[in-house]
Amino acid sequence: MTVYTYTVFLFNWENIGLMEQQNPDRLKKDRELIYAIVTAKGIISRFFWSILSFLITNLIFFFAAFVALLIYLLASVDNQFAFVFIAAIIFIIFYNIFFLSYLLFIYFKGQKAIENNCKYLLTILDIKSDELLPFSLLGSLRKGYMLDEMLLEQ
């Protein structure tokens, strides 16, 4: 059973009423698992788009600095263009420091949410970060089939 069909089944109101009558503890665990999956997806997508925007913005800044340097070298202009190039490089350095500190803030905020909200969330976040990002933010070596095994154990 995939996560999608499991979620659709779980949030069908008739099934929730039936499951509550049969085993209320099981329903609580299932709700916690679905909450963990949704929260992990949100955290990972925020990381992914933050890193992507960071790389794209850096490319734009470096291209602008490179164009300024080419204009300075090819044309006979004042030394003010060298100042523009140096200012662009300094701006890129400070932008990188600021944005990397922002990514660390998101990372620690996500870690705190993991510890406070759900026991399943750390495992799911490890699995999804391995699938979505070129490197694992949590240093995980787990594979996607662990999520299916965890659902089957429930």
UniProtKB/Swiss-Prot annotation:
Q: Which GO terms describe its cellular component?
A: plasma membrane
Origin species: Mycoplasma genitalium (strain ATCC 33530 / DSM 19775 / NCTC 10195 / G37) (Mycoplasmoides genitalium)
Chief place where the protein resides: membrane
Q: Phenotype upon knockout? A: Not essential, it can be deleted.
Which keywords appear in this protein's UniProt record, sorted alphabetically?
Cell membrane, Membrane, Transmembrane, Transmembrane helix
- Membrane topology for this entry? Multi-pass membrane protein
> Does this UniProt record's set of keywords contain Membrane?
yes
Q: Does the keyword Transmembrane helix apply?
A: yes
> Where are the bilayer-spanning segments?
54-74, 81-101
> What name does this protein carry?
Uncharacterized protein MG149.1
Q: Where in the cell is it found?
A: Cell membrane
